[in-house]
């Protein structure tokens, strides 16, 4: 069962159609690593994360940000089954990577911030409410494998 109204789905999909995954993905993951520096420990193989400029200019950060937002695009296509959509990723992040599930919530909130910056007046309070609901649903789905 979905908690998303028709209005939520319309707000999410119409904004998503405008999102440049490459730009928004790198910006979102980069900001996560700058604002919440303890998250950097999951990205040891990314090279220098020694300063905000190093993080924001890091091609591996940008590439992984694209991967994250591409995955989010799949969620947007499957809003009625977020848990099913993220089953394998939840297992990977829980069992192999041991990512604190709180980080999923933080990433979602950073994404909402990035969307607000990129889309300004289009990112109305109603659109934000729909996106907050969606990123909370994604965070919950990603945390579903945790005990």
Swiss-Prot record:
Keywords (A to Z) from UniProt: Heme, Iron, Metal-binding, Oxygen transport, Transport
Binding site for heme b: 64, 93
InterPro entries: Globin (IPR000971), Globin-like_sf (IPR009050), Globin/Proto (IPR012292), Hemoglobin_b (IPR002337), Hemoglobin_oxygen_transport (IPR050056)
Domain of life, per lineage: Eukaryota
UniProt keyword Transport present: yes
One record GO biological process: hydrogen peroxide catabolic process
Expression sites (tissue/organ): Red blood cells.
Gene Ontology molecular function: haptoglobin binding; heme binding; hemoglobin alpha binding; metal ion binding; organic acid binding; oxygen binding; oxygen carrier activity; peroxidase activity
Region forming the signal peptide: none
Stored Gene3D superfamilies: Globins
One Gene Ontology cellular component: haptoglobin-hemoglobin complex
SUPFAM superfamilies: Globin-like (SSF46458)
Self-association state and partner proteins as the record states: Heterotetramer of two alpha chains and two gamma chains in fetal hemoglobin (Hb F).
Family, per entry: Belongs to the globin family.
Function: Gamma chains make up the fetal hemoglobin F, in combination with alpha chains.
Protein name (record): Hemoglobin subunit gamma
Gene: HBG1
């Amino acid at each position: 069962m979905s908690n998303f109204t028709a209005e939520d789905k319309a707000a999410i999909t119409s904004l998503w159609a405008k999102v440049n995954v490459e730009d928004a993905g790198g910006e979102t993951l980069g900001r996560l690593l700058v604002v919440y520096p303890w998250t950097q420990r999951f990205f040891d193989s990314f090279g220098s994360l020694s300063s905000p400029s190093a993080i924001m200019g890091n091609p591996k950060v940008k590439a992984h940000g694209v991967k994250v937002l591409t995955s989010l695009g799949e969620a947007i296509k499957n809003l009625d089954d977020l848990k099913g959509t993220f089953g394998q990723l939840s297992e990977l992040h829980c069992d192999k990577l041991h990512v604190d599930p709180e980080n999923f919530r933080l990433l979602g909130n950073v994404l909402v911030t990035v969307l607000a910056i990129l889309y300004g007046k289009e990112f109305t309070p109603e659109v934000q409410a729909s996106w907050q609901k969606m990123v909370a649903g994604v965070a919950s789905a990603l945390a579903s494998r945790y005990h």
